[in-house]
Amino acid sequence: MTVPKSSPGPRSLTNRPSSAAEWWRQFLFGPPIPTHEQEQTRLPKLLALPVFSSDAISSVAYATQEILLALGAAGLAAAAHRAAYTRATWEVVGAICVLLLIVALSYRQTIFAYPSGGGSYIVSKDNLGVGFGLVAAAALLIDYVLTVAVSIASGVQNLLSTPAAAALAHQPVGVCLLFVALLMFANMRGLKESGVVFAGPTYLFILLAAVTVALGLLGPRLGWQLHPNAVNQTLPAGYAAAGSALGLFVILRAFANGCSAMTGTEAISNGIPAFRRPECANAATTLTWMALILGTLFVGISWLATSLHVVYWEKNGQTAPAVIDQLSGAVFGRTGPWVWLYYAMQIATAAILVLAANTSFADFPRLSSILAHDRFLPRQFANRGDRLVFTNGIVLLGLFAGVLIVIFRGNVDRLIPLYALGVFTAFTLSQAGMVVHWRRERGPGWLLKAVVNGIGALATAVVFAVIAIEKGPEGAWIVGVVAILMIVLFRAIHRYYVRLAQELRLDGEAPALQTPMQNTVLVLVGGVHRGIVPALRYARALTPRFQAVYVEIEPERTPIMEANWQRLFPEVPLVVLESPYRSLVGPLLDYIEQVKGKGPDDMVTVVIPEYFTDDWWDALLHNTAGPLLKLALLGRADVAVVNVRYHIHPAPAPAPSEQVRR
């Protein structure tokens, strides 16, 4: 029989809170959204850009800085080698832009080839095998956790460096955890609502960064006065021997550092189902926007930094001012009528660094759901919550990022060595997988597409190798160990689900439902009162032949109990179980073994009366024997436990004078 679907009624009628806890939950996270409204929660391109691209776009705040740091460590930032310093910077920036173009084209092709999302995991699994797919999945999940930790820690570091936050400067962990909680809260309200919240800061950063670059490069020709005293142009004494280490490895190291600009570029290909229809076209357009914005700002900031001869260094925990700080100070001034734009740029930079973590909150749960569908993670991660988001994945990501922040005390410099290794692992596997895909499909233009992806795979593999060699001793080896453990866990979960499916599979003819079985029904009673009546009625509905069981904890009460029972329920047999050690569970388990039938399918049903009160604190005044007994019987496949509730409506207590008269 098929039950016809009822038409969805007004949300106010179907989602009315049934309790105070439910009211607060809906107040904080919003009312549940029915499945048929899922399309309305999908993202238009203008909201999808900040949700999925804030990680990539925010990286321009430190990508150029990381390049200058690597070149400065080789002494190229010295005044005598300024031409080589500028030339090397542009060689690295140009190489990264070419790599960004290749990766963006690759993922644009991936979007149309794999419209269900999944990105590197799906591509690697389908074309290179399940093992490589799990490597990509583990790398991405680790990178998403690190993105949250690094982005929030970096943003908090920027915020706490301002004079207004001096009191919190030495307490970054609490502030970081607060931002993690806020991001969890925003994303649990729904992807569309989080996009609305985060769109403002993302677009503000893009606007202010573009204004800074434009005024810095073109402003002097139009009469705009720069403030070169805000720029650091020197290295500290003894920092490096000038020009001593110019070579291929220095360039590769600067290239690897600068490739932090590419973290997050795979996010859109993972989140295709979150886009409005047509999903693939909208996702591809958003990816193009992201690559253009990222590339333009990256080139512009690098151009302005080299034209102003910005130098960045780090020594013994001390650093030069951040490159973004130097550039905005040089363009707007740290004093004067435009100083508010300088502070606005610092706030916008800190905000987008914090919000960069939101990309992970969009993609980590979605990738987890795909892994759960493939039976490599628990099935709970495939379920959407009331707000049509993957709540379990959001919570797990927040917990892992919070633990990481606590372990590393919110220190960005200690977190950075772990970063980017995972994402370049995923890049390499994804693009290698696409090469196999094009060779197998051999559609129009397949050779050119395969060449593009092959070049991208080679380039990202080189970056991966450089990062692994350079940052491995600094802690990146931890990422490899964790990834191996995750893959072992994925395999173990998958084996369990395969065994479970084999156990539950129905082969051949449909099983007979009329096989003989004996069901012995026992009603556990602790006294003769109105609270046991619903349980007795329920037991009679199961079978007219059932027993009431009383465990004798206080022997002196037994005669009264038996007399009252015979007077009120003479037709129901009462079994009294002695319990010399005052145990409720032990005697009952022994009796179950006595009365259980001998057949393999025979069952014993234990019916437990339970009180249900209007106020939660009233429940604390009642015996908890029922839950303890249910826990003791939990592992018994031949015993079913049923709780039958009696709703208590306590009458108002009589006045003291009435109690005296009685």
Stretches with model-predicted labels:
Residues 2-63, 74-77, 105, 116, ...:
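Membrane-interface "cap" regions at the ends of multi-pass membrane proteins
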Residues 234, 380-391, 427-472, 503, ...:
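C-terminal membrane-solvent junction of multi-pass transporters and transport-like membrane proteins
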Residues 216-227, 285-325:
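Extracellular/periplasmic helix-exit of transmembrane alpha-helices
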Residues 65-125, 129-134, 139, 150-179, ...:
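Extracellular loop-to-transmembrane helix junctions
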Residues 205-235, 302-310, 430-443, 492-501:
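Hydrophobic alpha-helical segments and their helix-loop junctions in multi-pass secondary transporters
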Residues 203, 210-261, 470, 474, ...:
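Helix-loop-helix junctions that connect adjacent transmembrane segments
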Residues 1-38, 499-662:
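Cytosolic C-terminal regulatory domains/tails of membrane transporters and channels
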Residues 130, 169-177, 274-296, 372-406, ...:
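Loop-to-transmembrane helix boundary motifs in multi-pass membrane proteins
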